[in-house]
């Protein structure tokens, strides 16, 4: 079973602030954003200046997968996510349904998942791993990396006050399912 990896100070506080501002300015209020389970989700594939920063982050995580897990992976999908008061995410796996493992999942090619925390001026919102009785208190610039399957069933505790911002990213071992050519 692969471990959950956590690295503090993965990116600078200035980079965290840049991504938060981008998310705030490009959320579901315009064509770049969407809403998923009441959370404003922002993509950034066509914004060159923010793409430079996110590519740098993705490449660092891809290199971490190689070093930590001896796996070559490719970017599958990534987004910036706003979590307001009352928002949470029930426990789940990122590549199969935990209540019905035989049911085809809509993202079966996700092999590794990462969450990059962009702020900590909120209460609640911890990421928890039910298989390990382990939770991560978000701190700006900290990243967690873990395999996407049944070994790492996880969720997010309810945000009790403030606003939580994260960058969620998934990686695949199958180059044919890569977001980038």
Regions found by a protein language model. Give the residues of each.
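Fe(II)/2-oxoglutarate oxygenase catalytic core
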Residues: 1-143, 151-181
